[in-house]
Design a protein with these regions (language model features):
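Active-site hotspot residues in diverse enzymes, especially metal/ion-binding acidic/histidine motifs
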Residues: 1-137
């Protein structure tokens, strides 16, 4: 079920910044996105230098479709969970409420990015997973 509050916020951000591309949104919000070696299991995390958030993404995904999901996921932490730090870990058996919320926002961002890129909604969730590298939940 789609949370209409989340959908409204995502649509507002897309309209305000003229895109749903999470990398462009981060840039327009002056949020640095850095690629670094985070090991095999850590896909991304948010760090802060003072009050300034930095999205750290695993360099192993720099040229892969999944870079969009991981960027959108970490961006969601910055926008909707300001001040909290976290990391997207593939092997985590326990997904916190914050991780679940960030994933929901990321998927809403990517549905809209798909519509922006293809002028239509994805026909299936699998189509969205394939295009933007959304990991199986």
């Amino acid at each position: 079920m789609v949370d209409l509050d989340k959908l409204g916020i995502v649509e507002f951000i897309g309209k305000r910044y003229g895109t749903f591309n999470p990398f462009v949104i981060a840039d327009k919000l002056n949020i640095a996105v850095e690629w670094c070696d985070l090991g095999h299991n850590l896909m991304g995390k948010v760090a802060y230098m003072g009050n300034h958030p930095i999205v750290l993404l695993n360099e192993a995904f720099k040229d892969k479709n999944s870079q969009y999901f991981y960027c959108a996921h970490e961006l969601a932490h910055v926008i909707w969970q300001e001040g909290l730090t976290g990391a997207y870990n593939l092997n985590s058996q326990f997904k916190s409420k914050f991780e679940y919320q960030a994933t929901q926002y990321a998927i809403l961002i990517l549905i809209n990015l798909y519509r922006e890129d293809y002028d239509r909604l994805p026909s299936t969730y699998r189509e969205l997973e394939t295009e933007y590298g959304i990991p199986e939940q």
